[in-house]
Amino acid sequence: MNGTLDTFFKARKDNGKTAIITGVTGQDGSYLAELLLQKGYKVVGLKRRTSLICTDRINLLFADPNFKLEYFDLNDVGCMWRLINQYKPDEIYNLAAQSHVRVSFDLSEHTADGIAMGTLRLLNAARELVPDAKFYQASSSEMFGDNPNYPFNEESTLMPASPYACAKVFAHHLVKNYRTSYGQYACSGILFNHESPRRGETFVTRKITMAAARIKLKMQQKLFLGNLDAKRDWGFAGDYVKLMWMMLQQEQPDDYVVSTGETHSVKEFLECVFDHAGLGNPDKYIEIDERLFRPQEVPYLLGDSTKAREKLGWKPEVTFKELAKMMYNEDLAFLQRNARGVAIDKMITPEIDMYGGEK
């Protein structure tokens, strides 16, 4: 960076607050960064060096003088402490993670270390260097796992069914422990599945919308999927990051479930998208590949966000059908602009699609 922090940030009138976002190049990180910049924050986005190819979601932010991007790794304690000490954030949003549930079975140690131990390292750094900073942890509905007693709220029993979910449970309990043991302002948002046009293409919703757009443009013939019967509580990521921010504006820290209160199957999402695309019954385009199933499936997730609605006044705005249509429309427009996929084999093979099971 050229010049001092003061010259870097003074170009825009701000609210005097600085926020650090880990995982800023991801879906949630990009939406959250935009929200905070709109609210006058100085935003320091942290990303892994290996995320270099994944900055498309935040490219427009580079023109904002209140946005700064730094390299970072949850496994690098020295880097973590240096950045927190340098920027002295008022708020820390920990969104970084290997977030693909199916992949966590293959990369279990990597997933667990980044999520569980990474959160521990970040909490320790915040407690020592910026004890008054507010800390947000991205917890996950996957922590509820196979628990049959849905809908799930903040008091529901956690029964994780994947390495990803187990790591999230560890981090979730750490946040509670640091809040009660040290008085640290630390809280977790238990986010149910949330999607957007910025969702990674290895996740089932985005796989479906992109495939439908390619099929519509005759760039693809088949789509390989796993369990179509899995049901999820799907919301819009842009709605969910608003609650992340709201959680850190309260006098006292607390944990909140973030959900729509509706559940839909993968098949329902598939049918909604293909109907909107004018492709008719999707069955003729779909092939089920058992390799896309998880070793342990979570069949049903449904959240109860009553606490967030009543205490914080939050509610989701984008409906399930609106979300599906939004994602398809964006993918279709992208392909039409860029002619993307022309060089791709017209039948996307199971090997290419290997990690495309539902989150």
Predicted regions and their residues:
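C-terminal substrate-binding subdomain of Rossmann-fold SDR/epimerase-dehydratase oxidoreductases
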Residues: 32, 38-39, 45-46, 72, ...
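N-terminal Rossmann-like NAD(P)+-binding domain of SDR-like oxidoreductases, especially those catalyzing
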Residues: 1-194, 238, 248, 300, ...
